[in-house]
Amino acid sequence: EHAPLVLAQRCSGVPAQTPLFTSLLNYRYSKPKVAAAHIADGIELLDGHERTSYPLSVTVDDHERDFTIVAKVCERIGPQRVCELMELALEQLTRALSANPGGELAELDVLPAAERAQVLHGWNETGRAYARDACLHQLFEAQVSRTPEAAAVICGDETLSYTDLDARANRLAHYLRGQGVGPDTRVGLALGRGVEMMTGLLAILKAGGAYVPLDPGYASERLRAILDDSRPAIVLADAAGRTALDALAGAPPIADLHADASRWSALPSTPPRVEGLTPRHLAYVIYTSGSTGQPKGVMVEHASVVNLWRALDEAIYRTHPSARRVSLNASIAFDSLVKQWVQLLSGRTLVVVPEPVRFDGRRLLDAIGRDRIDVFDCTPSQLALIEGARGPEDEAYPQVTLVGGEAIGEGMWSELASVSSRTYYNVYGPTECTVDATLARITAEHAPHIGGPLANVRAYVLNERLSPAPVGVRGELYIGGAGVARGYLNRPELTRERFIDDPFVAGGRLYRTGDLARWRTDGSLEYLGRNDFQVKIRGFRIELGEIEAQ
């Protein structure tokens, strides 16, 4: 019994304008032709072609002694390219049948040499010089000497100059050194956004340690899990942080940056000396959601953050030299905060966004305008609140908006692309690759995409065998280069699973993102979702396994 596909589609409920499927392979046995078909006197059928309404269809006719292959490809897919790929695949197949008839089809390399070179090397020619031998706090100290009286941090009515911030951080760093903090020593940071947070963060780096963000608003179970895994030598806290940690039995020693300030207020205001500290030591350990129910700590080194700073400077800030005021908007536990505070290394001013207004579009816009914030960094969810509240009087600020942490839908992309008075960038990157790995300016010429790799970053779209996927073909996105983290703290097996040797660069490492993507013909990447059950909420990665384990 046979039924036409039109009937099948009608019964399926799929709208008539939507293809029932987008590609069709039809293999059929056809008896060898013995004579031209006779239709009527004086008419002879020489040849014929079937037509389908599907974007891609391939018909294989088996004539016993030979085959006929006919491909029909709609124009927007690229008929010439599809036929070239088919020709190469058939060529490789015939060679394999002769040389290795027992081999697997998946081992065939169907990528043309020129295209292979493009996706592996051409679109990854991102090498740039940067300060490979400097630690973050050293670059900050160099900036202090250049702009000592410039505003470093503004928080409400309080403004702290570069000199004052440096002196405060140095005194606290001397105290931390006295508590045994040195290279790769982990120090908790349980503070809200503000002057104290930046003082504590810089002090930890100056003492040689790595900061471990602890959001005071986290559930006690999550705080306990992070503390048990990271085992910080000491925790720097404000009142809210201390309250959250005091509720936990067996918490590490706590230094309250308000109540305990007398312990270090008389210590030297010059940087402490830390022997053996290099850019390959840890700058921070940030915890992300874990599929087993336990959060996992991502270890990031100074050198990776220094490269992020330089890459963003090249990709964004040099294009907008007047953008001097940068929002300090993210939670301390969100790695997006890193690309915000590193702007201190360039002499910019960090403006703290008050917590009560962060998710009130109208009040947030008022704060951005009042504080003259030039660069705002947020998730699409937060941006939707801002744009929904924006009126004609709100056109000036911010000049530049960095949007990341979640995928941008087509509607928002089109809306942002239509704005001429402000510039929007879509940034993409997992915590394991130091915040941002790719970047795209949002313009009307393109549909939503995540752009290409930043300076000293490599991006590959690979199949299950770690072979590069052709342009336009979906695969898993792998990230290599200067941003790849050291690995997961206390998780050697997971580190080996997710951080692998780079098969294309000797001595390199790749991070398996779990994100699905494909290359576009212009060298940009299109994000296609996940290959697992991870989701993002307001920019935070959530493993459903962690929720199930509660």
Which residues are covered by each model-predicted region?
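Generic structural signal for small/hydrophobic residues in well-ordered secondary structure
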Residues: 1, 25, 58, 83, ...
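Adenylate-forming
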Residues: 1-84, 91-99, 109-110, 122-126, ...
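Gly/Ser/Thr-rich phosphate-binding loop
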Residues: 341, 345-348, 373-377, 387-449, ...
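Conserved coil-to-alpha-helix start sites within the AMP-binding
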Residues: 191-202, 217-221, 329-346, 358-363, ...
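AMP-dependent adenylate-forming
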Residues: 174, 220, 234-275, 305, ...
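Conserved AMP-binding/adenylation subdomain of ANL enzymes
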Residues: 296-325, 335-374
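AMP-binding/adenylate-forming domain of the ANL superfamily
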Residues: 47-68, 84, 88-91, 99-286, ...
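Conserved adenylation A10 loop of the ANL superfamily
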Residues: 285-298, 431
